[in-house]
């Protein structure tokens, strides 16, 4: 019997560090990487570029089915590069406006259905690290290792604040905290695929942990399950 391509899912709320950890883990293992949250950001970004309203479900469905996107390793070996329609949009899709749009389109069942098969197609040998909000519950329910990464809203706002300040953005910590709390409420209360840990997920609170500490804990779980071969 052919063994399925192994998948490690890392789910959690915005700012929990899941994207950074997932990219580093994929690099360490030499596996493929899926930033599913980026797909929703990419859709919101592409919708704006193509003049598609975020409430136009049919137009969003068509756009989602034809998104031309690739994930690749950054040249410095840290993180990932996201290419949309031949253009590097790694930084362009990370602002709060695009993030809010991503959360809005992610709440639409027709959009989630359109992107579901696209996400599953990233499951290729030798393995896949998938980060998002419903990777372990909806997209890859058979994944042999599921992580649910959390952190306090205050810590997540602080991390985002430092990240944006380092980029030269003019940001307000209180506003970021409010936005994160609002997004948490949207993501956990939505009717389709709400943000929640899978029943068999390992829950990690990263509030007081460094990225390296989180990574090492996950690598220990990978070794225990002999997933890396």
From Swiss-Prot:
Q: What is its EC number?
A: 2.7.4.25
Q: Per the UniProt record, which residue ranges are transmembrane?
A: none
Q: Where in the cell is it found?
A: Cytoplasm
A GO MF term: ATP binding
Listed InterPro entries? Cytidylate_kin, Cytidylate_kinase_dom, P-loop_NTPase
A GO-annotated cellular component: cytosol
- What is the top EC class of this enzyme, as a single word? transferase
Alphabetically sorted, this entry's keywords are:
ATP-binding, Cytoplasm, Kinase, Nucleotide-binding, Transferase
Q: Where does ATP bind?
A: 12-20
Q: What is its main location?
A: cytoplasm
GO BP annotation list: nucleobase-containing small molecule interconversion; pyrimidine nucleotide metabolic process
Its catalytic activity? CMP + ATP = CDP + ADP; dCMP + ATP = dCDP + ADP
Q: Which family does it belong to?
A: Belongs to the cytidylate kinase family. Type 1 subfamily.
Official protein name in the record: Cytidylate kinase
What's the source species for this entry? Stutzerimonas stutzeri (strain A1501)
């Amino acid at each position: 019997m052919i063994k399925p391509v192994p998948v490690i899912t890392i789910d959690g709320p915005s700012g929990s560090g899941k994207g950074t950890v997932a990219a580093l883990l994929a690099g360490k293992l030499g596996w493929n990487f899926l930033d599913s949250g980026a797909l929703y950001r990419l859709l919101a970004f592409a919708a704006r570029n193509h003049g598609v309203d975020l409430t136009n479900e049919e137009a969003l469905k068509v756009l989602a089915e034809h998104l031309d996107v690739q994930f690749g390793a950054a040249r410095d070996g840290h993180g990932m590069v996201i290419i949309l329609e031949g253009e590097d949009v790694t930084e362009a899709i990370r602002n709060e406006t695009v993030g809010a749009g991503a959360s809005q389109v992610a709440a639409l069942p027709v959009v989630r259905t359109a992107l579901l098969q696209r996400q599953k197609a990233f499951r290729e040998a030798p393995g896949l690290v998938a980060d998002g909000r419903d990777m372990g519950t909806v997209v890859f329910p058979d994944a042999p290792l599921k992580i649910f990464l959390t952190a306090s809203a205050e810590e997540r706002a602080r991390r985002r604040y430092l990240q944006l300040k380092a980029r030269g953005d003019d940001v307000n910590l209180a506003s970021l905290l409010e936005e994160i709390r609002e997004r948490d409420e949207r993501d956990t209360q939505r009717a389709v695929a709400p943000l929640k840990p899978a029943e068999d997920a390992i829950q990690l609170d990263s509030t007081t942990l460094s990225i390296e500490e989180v990574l090492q804990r996950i690598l220990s779980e990978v070794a225990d399950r002999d997933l890396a071969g």
